[in-house]
Swiss-Prot record:
Biological classification of the source: Viruses, Riboviria, Pararnavirae, Artverviricota, Revtraviricetes
UniProt domain comment: Terminal protein domain (TP) is hepadnavirus-specific. Spacer domain is highly variable and separates the TP and RT domains. Polymerase/reverse-transcriptase domain (RT) and ribonuclease H domain (RH) are similar to retrovirus reverse transcriptase/RNase H.
Catalyzed reactions per annotation: DNA(n) + a 2'-deoxyribonucleoside 5'-triphosphate = DNA(n+1) + diphosphate; Endonucleolytic cleavage to 5'-phosphomonoester
Classification via PANTHER family: POL PROTEIN (PTHR33064), RIBONUCLEASE H (PTHR33064:SF37)
Annotated stretches, region: Disordered: 186-229, 275-305
Protein name: Protein P
Function: Multifunctional enzyme that converts the viral RNA genome into dsDNA in viral cytoplasmic capsids. This enzyme displays a DNA polymerase activity that can copy either DNA or RNA templates, and a ribonuclease H (RNase H) activity that cleaves the RNA strand of RNA-DNA heteroduplexes in a partially processive 3'- to 5'-endonucleasic mode. Neo-synthesized pregenomic RNA (pgRNA) are encapsidated together with the P protein, and reverse-transcribed inside the nucleocapsid.
The family this protein is said to belong to: Belongs to the hepadnaviridae P protein family.
EC number: 2.7.7.7, 2.7.7.49, 3.1.26.4
Organism for this UniProt entry: Hepatitis B virus genotype D subtype ayw (isolate Japan/JYW796/1988) (HBV-D)
Amino acid sequence: MPLSYQHFRRLLLLDDEAGPLEEELPRLADEGLNRRVAEDLNLGNLNVSIPWTHKVGNFTGLYSSSVPVFNPHWKTPTFPNIHLHQDIINKCEQFVGPLTVNEKRRLQLIMPARFYPNFTKYLPLDKGIKPYYPEHLVNHYFQTRHYLHTLWKAGILYKRETTHSASFCGSPYSWEQKLQHGAESFHQQSPGILSRPPVGSSLQSKHQKSRLGLQSQQGHLARRQQGRSWSIRARVHPTARRPFGVEPAGSGHTTNFASKSASCSYQSPVRKAAYPTVSTSKRRSSSGHAVDFHNLPPSSARSQSERPVFPCWWLQFRNSKPCSDYCLSHIVNLLEDWGPCTEHGEHHIRIPRTPARVTGGVFLVDKNPHNTAESRLVVDFSQFSRGNYRVSWPKFAVPNLQSLTNLLSSNLSWLSLDVSAAFYHLPLHPAAMPHLLVGSSGLSRYVARLSSNSRIFDHQHGTMQNLHDYCSRNLYVSLLLLYQTFGRKLHLYSHPIILGFRKIPMGVGLSPFLLAQFTSAICSVVRRAFPHCLAFSYMDDVVLGAKSVQHLESLFTAVTNFLLSLGIHLNPNKTKRWGYSLHFMGYVIGSWGSLPQDHIVHKLKECFRKLPVNRPIDWKVCQRIVGLLGFAAPFTQCGYPALMPLYACIQSKQAFTFSPTYKAFLYKQYMNLYPVARQRSGLCQVFADATPTGWGLAMGHQRMRGTFQAPLPIHTAELLAACFARSRSGANILGTDNSVVLSRKYTSFPWLLGCAANWILRGTSFVYVPSALNPADDPSRGRLGLCRPLLRLPFRPTTGRTSLYAVSPSVPSHLPDHVHFASPLHVAWRPP
């Protein structure tokens, strides 16, 4: 007869009517019993012949997560003009005095961040935007291009102009300006001015003056630079070696490399094409010629280039006869002025050699499960985390549940701050640009690659045999709808583009590490600046705690102003005030301890509701289930040990079958959650020790001993001794000399014993006692006569590696008398 749930509970000693612990508990360590129970609950039977189940509720295998849904009305989020101040260390020092070594080191790591992988694989531009939504190809293409354009405008991306130069928007950092141009370094004379050396044409300098308000010194600079070494270099290295499908960047930046013999008449239309702010009457009158001007490479490049230069694909439709009712020329003729073929940033810098390729693909998804109106860009740089050349990312400490509870479980009022676009605060060195490239090959190649009726001839370097091969009803309808959204930007977005990251991207394993270092350093500074405040962060989640609500509000204002002065952007709409129970990292933390948040409890209920019994479940789905159950395991009676059968099946990559008893056992475990309480410091007065044959306890002046029926492995014996000490004395601080018991990981013990011990020792704190000093050592060896003196061993709760204690300075004595006695200013308060 299979083991019933009631019997199983009694076996695990979870019921009160169990016999004496000293007899019952050692039985659970018996290998035979564990094997029989495993067979009864069908836990050991890993080889099954029935087909596996691949979906349980919302859980599918790890590698086939739910299919994202495309939303044609996604809004591209706006990005504030994020510019983290370069002298952030000085600013903090002005605010709080000298920084500690740790804070300084962490802030130096991100000013600027560096990324140098050993090996980078370059992919063709066609792979730039992933065809993630086959039904909505064109729509997804333009939405993604618009998102990338928004990031570039916000100063988060560089735009590759030529192999060695890039342009960007926003405020430059010093490491972006001091880059070497040719043989000499070119320092910008006045900030905010285009660092592109003007070519000697009066017309051009006029344009630049009017657009950028150049100071007089810049004119002198222009004359000085005409015979620069790098305009000579440009003539030596042809800029013409371009991969197919990428148009020459001749329209703007490359003009500077043109040899001085290039006539003014050649340069002015190019300038006009590049900057629509200049009057465009001439361009409108002869739209056909504008195209030709537009793509003329500099004369130097043209002389050495054998390849034909292709005119702008989009504008070519203007002069061609419509091929049908759905010809793209109808759309192109909607507007006279489609604007420039390319845009250029406010600043140009020199970069290491960057090929016209991408290193990762991008696509859009919902911003988060609760916000499907806005999109989020997913960047896939997974090439750096796999294969032979994978980068092993730095590890960093994340506080475990007990440390977090020790730290944050208190009677404080809490609020959490939301850092907007946290990753995009941290600047990357331009030298990382060649490794982090995204982009697209332009609409023509994107559509051609994916549509069936058009053919690409590679020997023609990506030209189409016939311009109208593209025209199709689907494309026409999509573009017409998109025209209502994007207007003349359709032209700009249909061109190829290559962008590199200027701030750290989310798809690289280095980014979470850098973000964690950055926010923890900032919180450390805040804690020292405001001694009565507890500031803590995990990634971009920053929480502030204070003794009273009034104090918290004034702190909030002061801390917000401090963060804004460093250039950190907060999202005021998302500031949450939690009262006395803080919601953080998926937990609710209050003075009583911590519990999982409601949405996780809801997920647990759903999971058990849909969990099939007696059906083999694919081990990948088990991974998902264990992920959820593992998060809440510390709040259950038996903890992680209860999940060991599941872990075992995942490790052996076998299907797992839930028996009704095991499911009922887990269900009861997870429907009654117990808070994890804060550990309190105290003195240890109860000690336990064991040998393979016997155990001994020392409680105050009392000594006890006992023997096991059969010799046991030493770790098992030590665990049993600790359980006896806890049940006999009721003390929640125990001394032991066994490191495994000390670690409170009971997953390596016999399964039943691990489950029972977890419940008996729940909420117990352990102190390490060296064997030589352990008062329970003698009784465990059967010697009761000798009494070693009891040690005075203090227990201090740990906050893990989250070093926090900035000791509060004493409060000045001349405070006015009417300060309320509960005011945090009156008592120098230290974190719990």
